[in-house]
Amino acid sequence: MNLETIIGLEVHVELKTNSKIFSASPTEFGAEPNTQTSVIDLGYPGVLPTLNKEAVNFAMKAAMALNCEIATETKFDRKNYFYPDNPKAYQISQFDKPIGENGWIEIEVDGKKKRIGITRLHLEEDAGKSTHTADGSLVDYNRQGMPLIEIVSEPDMRTPEEAYAYLEKLKSIIQYTGVSDCKMEEGSLRCDANISLRPVGQEKFGTKAELKNLNSFTYVQKGLEHEQVRQEKELLSGGIIQQETRRYDEATKKTILMRVKEGSDDYRYFPEPDLVELYIDDAWKEEVRASIPELPDARKARYVAEIGLPAYDAHVLTLTKEMSDFFEAAIADGADAKLTSNWLMGEVLAYLNKQQKELKDVALTPAGLSKMVQLIEKGTISSKIAKKVFNELIEKGGDPEEIVKAKGLVQISDEGTLRKVVTEILDNNEQSIEDFKNGKDRAIGFLVGQIMKATKGQANPPLVNKILLEEINKR
């Protein structure tokens, strides 16, 4: 029996508003526990919620960027459940009239493009956060009432790789709109994954398992990969899949059962009595639509068509708005686009990944990178020397020209000076000359290495090669 994997994702994104969705409480991350909450957030008797218009604008902006249809009439509902981090015993969410529906995004995996549908995007408030210790449980209500959008995909993904690509693309689009920073480590982007298997050709879905507590895109992919194998083994051996909630454990590389679901959750939704229905007219929609900036796909296409970058470079540079904006600022200062792209995708990304930092955390500026690239273009420094300059720029900042002068790193491009060095090296390496003339090409590499060593790596490489061949041919 051949089985097909069905994957759908539910993503919660925290909106970057200055105050909470139904109160004036601040939304700063990392504050002392229970210092950013109010009687409205905690549901004290007699208090009333007031809808944050900016949260609605942000939700519409995200929905439009995800190609959703925007509702003209939308409303809020009470989702009833009891849990210690939910002090009101209900959550204000949206049930049957979400703000956005029927959207899609396009992903690319192994060179193949695929459209993934988005069922709905709705607004809701976040719950508090429970921390469990050996002595008991602690609850921080700072997060209670934070504005969220929940983005529910269609079950259109067929592999864990597609799920990863979907999340990467979704995060990129949301970041470009500016409505959220999408930092998983701070909880501003959270993902639950639903996965089931069915025989190829069957229309009815199999019984799904829900994966929770997935704190990185890599964990989402790994969790789905394991769950795919687990369910396949169970089904092929004649077993049945139970509807379960599971979590991915990185230590064991497995998904672990959290609880078995006997039926669907009954949250007893009913319209929120303290909030009127919301009417969104065309003028409001167009005002929000006009605020949407250039999105990653459009920017990627422009980089290829107008700037002349390879498609791969354009893809990597536009994955995050931060990197893309940095690139644009650098080339606006006069640096060659392809050379700038090479440095960003190579040395810069390698440094950021190793140090677990973002561009805003380092001293390197677009102007600094641009000047360094232009020094390479002019032949003032070689790419090898540039790495020394780069290390200084990204750690401490500064002016590339001043760094080059202070450290004596100017590339030697005077032909007379280099010819003298080349002659001395050749005089001391007669055997290497003979080896090269006898067809051993590696000998030339040895000679170049000796010349670079003698000049402390500051010789102009193309000029060295030219002079070296000229001098060898004279002998």
Curated annotation (Swiss-Prot):
It catalyses: L-glutamyl-tRNA(Gln) + L-glutamine + ATP + H2O = L-glutaminyl-tRNA(Gln) + L-glutamate + ADP + phosphate + H(+); L-aspartyl-tRNA(Asn) + L-glutamine + ATP + H2O = L-asparaginyl-tRNA(Asn) + L-glutamate + ADP + phosphate + 2 H(+). It comes from the Bacteria. It comes from Bacillus anthracis. The keyword ATP-binding applies. GO terms for biological process: glutaminyl-tRNAGln biosynthesis via transamidation; translation. The keyword Phosphoprotein does not apply. Belongs to the GatB/GatE family. GatB subfamily. Heterotrimer of A, B and C subunits. Its EC number is 6.3.5.-. Pfam families: GatB_N, GatB_Yqey. This is Aspartyl/glutamyl-tRNA(Asn/Gln) amidotransferase subunit B. Allows the formation of correctly charged Asn-tRNA(Asn) or Gln-tRNA(Gln) through the transamidation of misacylated Asp-tRNA(Asn) or Glu-tRNA(Gln) in organisms which lack either or both of asparaginyl-tRNA or glutaminyl-tRNA synthetases. The reaction takes place in the presence of glutamine and ATP through an activated phospho-Asp-tRNA(Asn) or phospho-Glu-tRNA(Gln). Coiled coil: none annotated. Keywords: ATP-binding, Ligase, Nucleotide-binding, Protein biosynthesis. GO terms for molecular function: asparaginyl-tRNA synthase (glutamine-hydrolyzing) activity; ATP binding; glutaminyl-tRNA synthase (glutamine-hydrolyzing) activity.
